[in-house]
Amino acid sequence: MFVSYKWLEDYVDLKGMDPAVLAEKITRAGIEVEGIEYKGEGIKGVVIGHVLEREQHPNADKLNKCLVDIGAEAPVQIICGAPNVDKGQKVAVATVGAVLPGNFKIKKAKLRGEESNGMICSLQELGIESKLVAKEYAEGIFVFPNDAETGSDALAALQLDDAILELGLTPNRADAMNMLGVAYEVAAILDTEVKLPQTDYPAASEQASDYISVKIEDQEANPLYTAKIIKNVTIAPSPLWMQTKLMNAGIRPHNNVVDITNFVLLEYGQPLHAFDYDRFGSKEVVVRKAAENEMIVTLDDQERKLSADHLVITNGTKAQAVAGVMGGAESEVQEDTKTILLEAAYFNGQKVRKASKDLGLRSESSVRFEKGIDPARVRLAAERAAQLIHLYAGGEVLAGTVEEDHLTIEANNIHVSADKVSSVLGLTISKEELISIYKRLGFTVGEADDLLVVTVPSRRGDITIEEDLIEEAARLYGYDNIPSTLPETAGTTGGLTPYQAKRRKVRRFLEGAGLSQAITYSLTNEKKATAFAIEKSLNTVLALPMSEERSILRHSLVPNLLDSVSYNLARQTDSVALYEVGSVFLTKEEDTKPVETERVAGAVTGLWRKQLWQGEKKPVDFFVVKGIVEGLLDKLNVLDSIEFVQSERKQLHPGRTANILLNGSLIGFIGQVHPSLEKELDIKETYVFELDLHALLAAETAPLVYTAIPKYPSVTRDIALVTDKTVTSGQLESVIKEAGGKLLKEVTVFDVYEGEHMEEGKKSVAFSLQYVNPEQTLTEEEVTKAHSKVLKALEDTYQAVLRG
C-alpha cells in the first residue's frame, strides 16, 4: 500500500511531522513501513510557464520555437520537440540551471541555429513512470489547467514535493488498504481525530428508481448491490489534484468519472464501477452466475470465457461486468457518455478470487474484495463518488439509491478486563488507560461489572477475540514502553490432554501388535494426492513447489506408506508392517484454507508368523489386518459401534475391501491393494487400512463395565459353512451373534477356502463359536439348542449350510 504524506494530511493533522518520524511511529505500532520515496528528490528549478507564442522552427520540421512566460522579467525562447505544444498552454519548464532526474542539468543551448533557454518538460522527464501518465500526454508534454499560476513551483502543482510511504501490510490488515484506514491508524498513534470527507450534494427531483431496478439471484455471492443514476455528466480530464494523487498511488488517470471511482477506491477501500447507462442496454440490473462458456469482452479489450462459478452483472440478458473483477467494454464510459449507472456492492471475496484466478485477471477491485472490505462503507463510498461526479463532471444525481440488501452487519462486542491485559502484557494498566486506547482506535467502549465491553467497527475485521484487543492495547501503549519482566503465571502440572493420551494409546497398541511407526512426507504428487482418500477433497497446490513430486498436500496416508513398503521390499525385507499417525489436508471449496485432520493408517505385507517358535508360518491376509483394526477399535472402546461393510474402491481389490462405519458414518476402510497397483509398485500382496483418528477419538464411548471371569467352563463348536462368494464373513458373523443368544460369548473366523472341490460361485467360511453360561455349567442340550438356532438362521438368511 502506497500512502501519500500530503494526501494523508487531508484526514489527519500531522503537525508538520517529518515523514521519516511518522514512518518510525507507524512501524513501532505494528505496521511496517518498508520504505519512503521522496517524489521529486534532486529536482529543482522547474516552474509553470505560459506559452505566449509558438511557431515552426525555421531549420527543423519536428521542432517548435516557443516564447514562454516563466514569471521572470521577460519571456524566454525555448525550442521544444513535443508534438502537442501550442500557444496559450501552461506547461512545466525546466529553467536554465535546473536539475532533472539523473542529475541532468539544463543549460543555454543552440538547437539548429536557434537559442533555447530551458526545456518544456513531459511528466516522464520529471521522473513519473510512463505507465502512470495519462494517454493524452504519453507522447508529449503535460499541460496544466489554465488557472495554474505562471512562475509557480511546478513540482508542488504536480505534488512531486510529496513523500510516499510504502506499507508492508500483513493479510489480516485489509482495513489499512485505503487512505481512511491508514488515517484511523495514524490518528490513533498520534492521539488525534480523523477528518472525514464530506458527501453532501444536491439531489435532482427525478427518482433513480424510475431508471433502474436491481435483482440479485445469488445472495450468498452478492448480499448487497446498490445503484445510483447520475445524468448530464460531461466527460473531461479530472482535476489536477486528483490526477496527481492517483499517480502517486500508482494509478494512471483516465477521465473524471473513472478517476473518481478509482479515487474513492483508494480513499474508502470500496471498489466502484461506473457503467454508461445508455450503453448498458436495459433498465434493470440482474446479478447472476454466468452461463457455462458465456463470453464477455472486458475493459482491457480481451474476450474472456466464463464459467458457472463466476458472478456477472447483467442487463437482464447479457453480461456487462465480471462482478468484483472488471467491467465490460460494451458499457464502458466514453467521451460521449451522458448518464452514469454507478455500482457499489458487497461481493463474496472467495467468489471474486475464484473468478480473478480463473480469468488471470487481477485488479485493484478484486484484491480488495479478496482481502475483505468494510460492509458499512458500501453506501458511503457511493455517496462520496456521487458528490465528486456532481462537482467535477457536472452530473445531476437522481434522488434515492436503488438496491437489494441481504447483508447483515452484526455488532462485534468483545469483553476484556484491565487485569487480563495487565497480566498478559506484564505491566499495570488501568481501566481508564485502556478505555482511552480503545477510543483512540475509534472503538466504542462500555462497561459491565469489572469488564469493558468493546464494540469494534466493521472496518476492523481482524479483531474478533479478547486476545486481539490485548494486542491492540499493546500496540498503542507502545511495545517499547512495556517493561522487561518475567511472565507471571501460576504453576501448572505437566500432562497430556485426553486427545493426546488416546493418540499415544493408538501408537502403543499398533506397535504392540507388531507394526513399526513410519513418518512420511505430507506433500505428494497429483496422481497420489487423491488416491485412497476416505472422502473427496479438492487439491491444495503449493505455489512454488521444490518439485512436482512434492507439490500437493496429501489427502491420505496410504500412498506414501505403500512407497515405504516398496522401498523396503526392494532391499530384501520380505515382511513389512508399518503404521503412521499423521495429518491429511482436505479442501471442500476452491480458494478456501484446507482443513488439517489426523488419520492413522497401516500397510502390512509378507508373513505374519515367520519364526518356527511362533508356530506354523502364516502369510498376511485380510483377516489378520482386520483383527489388528478390531483390536485397536476395541482398545478405544468403540468396537460395539463399528460396522464393516463390503465396498469397492478404485485402488483396492474388489472382493477384499470394506468400509468402516462408526455409528453409520464412514470413518475409514480396510482392504487389499489392487493387484494392478501392486504390480505397478512392484510389491507383493499387501493389505492397508486408514481411519479418521479425529472422529475415532472424539466418539462418545460407553463406560467400561466390569464383568467377572466365568466360573463355569465354556463349550466351543467349530463350523465350516458353504455359502455364496458374495456373502461376507461379517454378514455371517452378524447372523450368528443375533441367533446365538445370551449363551454365545465369542465368534471367531479362522478359515476361508475357495479352492478345489468347491462349487462354482461358492466358498467355505469357518467359525469358532464359544458358548458359556456365567451362572451354571452348560448342558449338552443347552448348547445343542443354541447351536441349532444359529445353523437354522444361517440357512434361512444366506442359504449357508454345513460343509460336508
Curated annotation (Swiss-Prot):
Record-linked SUPFAM superfamilies: Anticodon-binding domain of PheRS, Class II aaRS and biotin synthetases, Nucleic acid-binding proteins, PheT/TilS domain, Putative DNA-binding domain
Any one GO BP annotation for this protein: phenylalanyl-tRNA aminoacylation
Keyword flag Cytoplasm: yes
CDD domains for the chain: PheRS_beta_core, tRNA_bind_bactPheRS
Stretches assigned to the B5 domain: 409-484
Enzyme class at the top of the EC tree: ligase
Classification via InterPro entries: aa-tRNA-synth_II/BPL/LPL, B3/B4_tRNA-bd, DNA-bd_dom_put_sf, Fdx_antiC-bd, Fdx_antiC-bd_sf, NA-bd_OB-fold, Phe-tRNA-ligase_IIc_bsu, Phe-tRNA-ligase_IIc_bsu_bact
Gene Ontology terms for molecular function: ATP binding; catalytic activity, acting on a protein; magnesium ion binding; phenylalanine-tRNA ligase activity; transferase activity; tRNA binding
Entry EC no(s): 6.1.1.20
Cystine bridges: none
Nucleotide-binding among keywords: yes
Main location: cytoplasm
GO CC terms, sorted: phenylalanine-tRNA ligase complex
Subcellular location(s) per record: Cytoplasm
Family: Belongs to the phenylalanyl-tRNA synthetase beta subunit family. Type 1 subfamily.
HAMAP family the UniProt entry points to: Phe_tRNA_synth_beta1
PANTHER family: PHENYLALANINE--TRNA LIGASE BETA SUBUNIT, PHENYLALANYL-TRNA SYNTHETASE BETA CHAIN AND LEUCINE-RICH REPEAT-CONTAINING PROTEIN 47
Descriptive protein name: Phenylalanine--tRNA ligase beta subunit
Source organism of this protein record: Bacillus subtilis (strain 168)
